[in-house]
């Protein structure tokens, strides 16, 4: 049976940790969105009917000046778990559209 040197394994450890760190950080970054496109999406899909034209004066929760993470926002857009809030799966709204809408609401 072959014996492996622990020194050989330790030699690669910094490299493996660097790669792991890069993968973790790149997976956590918020996609870049265009607020102007997000504004169009907000109007086009009648978000203002419930959330109001400014995102803070409707029947539904306040959505302007968002403080939630992008990933939480995306989860709500995809499936809010509410019978009132429509679901927007990837077939209805692209990841870029979600990022645009998020950028618009963060900027309000």
Regions found by a protein language model. Give the residues of each.
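N-terminal secretory signal peptides that target proteins for export/translocation
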Residues: 1-10
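Sec-dependent N-terminal signal peptides
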Residues: 9-20
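Bacterial signal peptide processing site
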Residues: 29-31
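C-terminal capping alpha-helices of c-type cytochrome domains
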Residues: 90-108
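Gly/Gly-Pro-rich "capping" loops immediately C-terminal to redox-active cysteine motifs
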Residues: 35-43, 52-87
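Short, cysteine/histidine-rich loop/knuckle motifs that typically chelate Zn2+
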Residues: 49
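C-terminal motif of bacterial Sec signal peptides marking the signal peptidase cleavage site
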Residues: 24-27
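The −1 position to Zn-ligating cysteines in a subset of zinc-ribbon hairpins
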Residues: 46
